[in-house]
Swiss-Prot record:
HAMAP family, per database record: NAD_kinase (MF_00361)
Protein name: NAD kinase
Keyword Cell membrane attached: no
GO biological process: NAD metabolic process; NADP biosynthetic process
First-level EC class: transferase
Organism lineage string: Bacteria, Pseudomonadati, Pseudomonadota, Alphaproteobacteria, Hyphomicrobiales
Role this protein plays: Involved in the regulation of the intracellular balance of NAD and NADP, and is a key enzyme in the biosynthesis of NADP. Catalyzes specifically the phosphorylation on 2'-hydroxyl of the adenosine moiety of NAD to yield NADP.
Binding site for NAD(+): 46-47, 116-117, 146, 154, 157-162, 218
Reaction catalysis annotation: NAD(+) + ATP = ADP + NADP(+) + H(+)
Pfam families assigned: NAD_kinase, NAD_kinase_C
Amino acid sequence: MKDTSLALHFVSSGTKESLSAQKDLVERYGHVAAEDADIIVALGGDGTMLQALRDFMNTGKPIYGMNRGSVGFLMNEFVIENLPERILAAQMETIRPLVMVAETEDAPPVEALAINEVSLFRQSYQAARIRITIDGKVRLQELVCDGVMVATPAGSTAYNLSAQGPILPLEAPLLALTPVSPFRPRRWGGALLPKHVTVRMDLLETEKRPVNAVADNNEVKSVTSVTVREAPNSQVTILFDKNHSWDERILTEQFRH
């Protein structure tokens, strides 16, 4: 007999493991169209969760993830039993994405949302040269580096963490501005920014030092400038098991050795 206390819509990464999990869960709890669902259940890794967060942005439908992938920082443990009870007891967190506007020499500006980060990285062996402006004021005249990123709290445990950036609580009203392999200023380790600021990154010597920009998985090649800010009218809700909340996850990650 199916448990129909919650109307669930399941999405999966398409791997054998996630499809098998989806089949078992649908048999037990049923499956409805996304527009009729109370909750979206994502099965896979963090990539699957990011796609679900993008797909269901501004729909008002919370997303509960279960790990059937290789990386699952945004996912809960996969357990078939008592899924509706776990969902109803889960902790809700609001995710607000960034909006990137990337400009190039010979094409219209490209706008894209990023839940994790907007990153710039060098296209060739030549280091990038980037001028960084915050709310109209130049804060760094020239950053020589392999790249630089603006990360959200949700994205602070991803590429940002690999680049030695800070981990941010989800509710923190902050963004992380983190360089990748900075050469000059050599000791500049990045900055924490109020979430309401607008960050502009202008590329210097673009013909000699081409740079690509990426908003999560949306790439724009050979950019001349990139503007990043929090998207003013976009949000989505993610659910975490209470015994494995975001706060617990970031504490565990910071004391991992």
